């Protein structure tokens, strides 16, 4: 009985994460805000509110990541003119992102990518946890107040 219960728990938990790299790739494009960084297994840096968000756009496995600063009216200001080029590749049933700038090249692995959650592991084994960005004031709220 205990084995059956354990197996059921494992199946349920494993089905909760999105590990299909093709689905992960479809979920990458969007505005993401950092929640925390797992530096080591017992060391986590929490971000309650970040001044910047990441915008990721990928089409046909090619795209970019750009830092943006959200405005109160729902728009965005580019934090800089720089962006990181991204090439997405599915290798050994894992989604890898290859970044390049004028100064560096590196690779990160997507661990989870759903509509609302993104977890990426970098070359130093740090895990970055993102959630889908939601403006503090949405245009829907403003319309209902008027």
List where the protein language model places each region.
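Sec-dependent signal peptide recognition
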Residues: 2-8
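C-terminal motif of bacterial Sec signal peptides marking the signal peptidase cleavage site
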Residues: 12-15
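N-terminal helix-cap/turn-to-beta initiation motif at the start of protein domains
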Residues: 19-33
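N-terminal glycine/threonine-rich, aromatic-flanked beta-hairpin/loop signature
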Residues: 45-90
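Hydrophobic residues embedded in beta-strands of well-ordered beta-sheets
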Residues: 62-64, 93-97, 117-118
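An anionic, turn-rich surface loop/hairpin at beta-sheet edges
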Residues: 77-111
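Ser/Thr- and Asn-enriched, surface-exposed coil loops between beta-strands
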Residues: 112-116
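Edge beta-strand at a domain terminus
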Residues: 119-146
């Amino acid at each position: 009985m205990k084995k059956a219960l354990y197996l059921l728990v494992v199946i349920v938990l494993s089905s909760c994460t999105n590990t299909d790299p093709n689905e992960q790739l479809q979920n990458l494009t969007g505005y993401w805000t950092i929640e925390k960084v797992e530096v080591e297994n017992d060391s986590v840096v929490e971000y309650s509110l970040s001044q910047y968000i990441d915008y990721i756009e990928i089409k046909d496995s090619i795209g970019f990541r750009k830092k943006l600063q959200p405005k109160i009216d729902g728009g965005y200001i580019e934090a800089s003119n720089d962006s990181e080029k991204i090439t997405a590749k599915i290798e050994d049933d894992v989604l890898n992102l290859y970044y390049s700038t004028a100064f560096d090249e590196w690779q990160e692995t997507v661990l989870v990518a759903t509509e609302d959650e993104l977890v990426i592991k970098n070359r130093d084994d740090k895990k970055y946890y993102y959630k889908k960005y939601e403006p503090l004031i949405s245009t829907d709220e403003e319309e209902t107040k008027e």
